[in-house]
Design a protein with these regions (language model features):
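Active-site catalytic microenvironments for nucleophilic, acid-base chemistry
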Residues: 4, 30, 108, 184-188
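Structural element of the ATP-grasp superfamily
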Residues: 1-2, 62-66, 181
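Short intrinsically disordered, low-complexity coil segments enriched in acidic
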Residues: 1-9, 13, 188, 228-230
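AMP-forming adenylation/ATP pyrophosphatase catalytic core
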Residues: 45, 121-233
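Solvent-exposed amphipathic alpha-helical surface segments
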Residues: 5, 69, 73, 112, ...
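Catalytic subdomain that performs nucleotidyl-dependent activation
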Residues: 8-17, 21-127, 135, 143, ...
């Protein structure tokens, strides 16, 4: 489509039909397996080229809308059997984690709060706003406290060469230390790699009472090594 329209691939957008239900299911899934504060925002309205314009609507509302369009004679997309949406044959199998959450956990939560979808999505939006703000603060601290060893003016650093965290990072609030360290590790490991909580904690432990712990050494995921002295971590 981008080639047909004569625009760069980076300007392309993929629109999905994810709904409130999908977002709530993802929230419970992450609650069960564990996640960071940002993970509790669940699905985002936009992530790169992926856009999710229906996150404020329930799955049932979307289905009702399609049926109203069909019944009123307006254009809809349907398969040869007239189905307006496709049900995956595995949806009823509780061996799949999402299906278990969808069939067992969410319905019971809805019994306690019939407005669960609206309530929980509103909560996730509040979490997202605060997460965005903290991320902006962390970006500022990242620029202040992180020095890449291979950094050259006008060029992207060679992240695998390592970096130094300034001694003064230890004086920042622990939540901001973790966010800066998380970004550093993501840069070094690559954005396809999941940063382990233990790795973040191991680096933060190199600071104590607002300064680096001289002589501290440890190893992390991805064969990364950490050491600390009065010059930094």
């Amino acid at each position: 489509l981008c080639a047909h329209a004569g625009v760069p691939l980076s300007q392309g957008r993929v629109f999905t039909a994810h709904t409130q239900d999908d977002r709530v299911e993802t929230f419970y899934m992450r609650s069960i397996v564990g996640t960071g504060p940002g993970g509790f925002r669940s699905m985002t309205y936009r992530n790169g080229c992926i856009c999710r314009p229906l996150l404020d609507e329930s799955r049932q509302n979307l289905r009702d809308y399609l049926m109203v369009r069909r019944d009123s004679g307006r254009s809809v997309c349907a398969d040869k059997s007239g189905n307006l949406w496709r049900e995956d044959e595995t949806n009823e199998c509780l061996d799949y984690f999402r299906n278990y959450v969808r069939q067992e956990i969410v319905p019971r939560a809805v019994e306690k709060n019939p407005k669960l979808l609206v309530t929980l999505c509103r909560t996730m939006n509040l979490l997202a706003d605060e997460d965005d703000y903290l991320s902006q603060c962390a970006d500022t601290l990242y620029e202040e406290h992180v020095s890449w060893l291979s950094a050259l003016p006008g060029r992207e650093p060679e992240y695998d060469a390592g970096c130094v965290l300034s001694p003064s990072l230890g004086q920042e609030a622990p939540v901001m230390q973790r966010r800066v360290v998380m970004r550093v590790l993501q840069e070094m490991l690559g954005f396809d790699e999941r940063v382990e909580t233990a790795s973040v904690q191991a680096i933060c432990q190199a600071f104590e009472q607002g300064k680096p712990v001289s002589g501290y050494v440890t190893n992390l995921q991805g064969d990364l090594a950490v050491s600390a002295n009065k010059q930094g971590v």
